[in-house]
């Protein structure tokens, strides 16, 4: 391919909202062009990267025994009303109606149409298992689309759906898809971690996310440094302390004056307390109107997902207002505690492990010290309600937990009958009885993984692609291509030879100044740069540069071809 035959649209101008490196470099390199908020045109170079990712995904899905299909982008409201998601999805669902005033939406995900197709075509267990996938454009009307294609309104996704007679069959395909996603990310060449995850709005039971490791990642994932345990922070847990080893304190409770101290940080600073000896008491109100006092150690944070999953809580909960708190405690937030607490207490294991703790006195401007569980506070329940922190012992007892940032690029679920049951997608089982098919759901963000790759690997000059998805493996950069017959002859022949060897190559024949060519090559991220000029040709040499290592060599063309092979 010659550069003059495609559109290389590099630019130095950037919109203010481009804060992530991936967003900046995709715009500067001319991979995408903004059309509207959260909606982008895929330019030729960007589309090449996208297609390479799609090809890897498609190849691995086919190897795993999945079959490709294509569902409509526009979905009738009746389907989503069967699962009640027409209203539950909220404003992210882009709704429209046709000339006959029938309601439709732009598909944000495709569980309903795939189940509709399956219930009409799959009638017996003999047709199962079946795994179907598509690579398609989705649309979710994000309230604040940001970070370029990382959180766009329109995006490209591979979504697969599997159908089964029983749970063991579903688990087998789930495990196959888990391995397939690992193969995809290995083949692309990204550092990643599969982590246990919350099922969220999709529903179902078992669930894993596939997180590309990157500092700009919105998700926090935790993993053990001594085992294969890994989980999203929403679900991550820790080895519970042995509460039987708590020391029985002989110290008596003391009430201390703490004027104008409303935060743990200020309390510890002004009163010289160890923050690990303090607790925070936060009041919530569940969906049934019940109030609870949630208690965690002073240096810990509540975990919303864990709290909403508690049997005692009618989800979703909200934080109690200042007025509600005062009406219950006759004290303001910042002075609340567990001693003589008027509402039910749910305390985290780490808070329960503290002896002689410090807490609010349920009276403004006062705190208690030397408060002890069981001796002073007996009416409480224990639960895991906090985020894990670095240094927590892994729940399997092997190693300690570490935290890092990740970008979610894949998510797999065991849906069971969450969609098939309400949509009456039934089969005749081996026992001759009718029952709902069980389902798995497997999503992979094709356009998102492109941004994740940039976040994981770049430098001050531009993108450093994994070679498997670089827009071109090799860029031939001829100096004075349009003026030197020798340079043109060598560059043209090398281009044809590399193409003949199956190497994806771009010949930059634009006639741009060397500095512009070199800067564009670094910015766009071609994996291998080949500079051809009269001076080196006189010695039978060309200059080779590896984009990833920045290593430069003056070598012969024969040596170059051997190196690239």
Curated annotation (Swiss-Prot):
Keywords: Aminoacyl-tRNA synthetase, ATP-binding, Cytoplasm, Ligase, Nucleotide-binding, Protein biosynthesis. It is an enzyme of class 6 (ligase). It catalyses: tRNA(Pro) + L-proline + ATP = L-prolyl-tRNA(Pro) + AMP + diphosphate. Gene3D superfamilies: Anticodon-binding domain, Bira Bifunctional Protein, Domain 2. It is found in: Cytoplasm. Its EC number is 6.1.1.15. GO terms for cellular component: cytosol. GO terms for biological process: prolyl-tRNA aminoacylation. InterPro entries: aa-tRNA-synt_IIb, aa-tRNA-synth_II, aa-tRNA-synth_II/BPL/LPL, Anticodon-bd, Anticodon-bd_dom_sf, Pro-tRNA-ligase_IIa, Pro-tRNA-synth_IIa_bac-type, Pro-tRNA-Synthase_IIa_type1. One of its GO terms (molecular function) is aminoacyl-tRNA deacylase activity. Consists of three domains: the N-terminal catalytic domain, the editing domain and the C-terminal anticodon-binding domain. PANTHER family: MITOCHONDRIAL RIBOSOME PROTEIN L39/PROLYL-TRNA LIGASE FAMILY MEMBER (PTHR42753), PROLINE--TRNA LIGASE (PTHR42753:SF2). Catalyzes the attachment of proline to tRNA(Pro) in a two-step reaction: proline is first activated by ATP to form Pro-AMP and then transferred to the acceptor end of tRNA(Pro). As ProRS can inadvertently accommodate and process non-cognate amino acids such as alanine and cysteine, to avoid such errors it has two additional distinct editing activities against alanine. One activity is designated as 'pretransfer' editing and involves the tRNA(Pro)-independent hydrolysis of activated Ala-AMP. Belongs to the class-II aminoacyl-tRNA synthetase family. ProS type 1 subfamily. Homodimer. This is Proline--tRNA ligase. It comes from Francisella tularensis subsp. holarctica (strain LVS).
